[in-house]
Amino acid sequence: MVSNEKSRLKKSGVSWEEAVARAGEYFRYAGSFDPDYVEWLGAYSDSSGIPLNELFVLLCDSEKGFCTDIMLNGKATADGSVFSVHTEDWRPADSKHLVLLKGRPRGEPSYLAMSSAGMELICGMNSSGLSFTGNSLDQNDMRVGVPKLFLARRLLASRTISEAMFVATEEDRASSYNVNICHKSGEMYCVEGSATDYALIYGA
């Protein structure tokens, strides 16, 4: 993953040293927002032998692609089922790193998530009956702040829709996905956001 990122950045005219320095500006926001995730990344760094500041570059990456999300509740399904659907339109070079991750964190709901190398949590569902997916948005107000992949982990730790919506609209976020939050009851919301603004769409 790191080697792929180095090659991609080099082609875009950004040196690896510059990328590491830029990502470092986000670190204190990330640590304040989710210290448990930072601790997890530290353990990942220790076990993989990849320096933490280099791993962190991957979590501050710009838009990776343009995914598609669909949410359906009982009003639109023949048997009353609720569906939360996501296509992961990823860079081909990184597709081999996509894995399903089953997590049972202490004090938080257990979850099943799509991840990149078990580190970046992309979308998933948890034992509280919540799911979230997200797709990339073009936005013109990106800034130094909490990386949106940190929001993804906290979304999976949410126990209620209101808690998940609070996470999705974190005021110090660096940027945002189009975040789709769904509950097993059929309640669903789309939070279409950027770094400094968002629109809330209720899926009736």
Where does each model-flagged region fall?
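N-terminal nucleophile
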Residues: 1-204
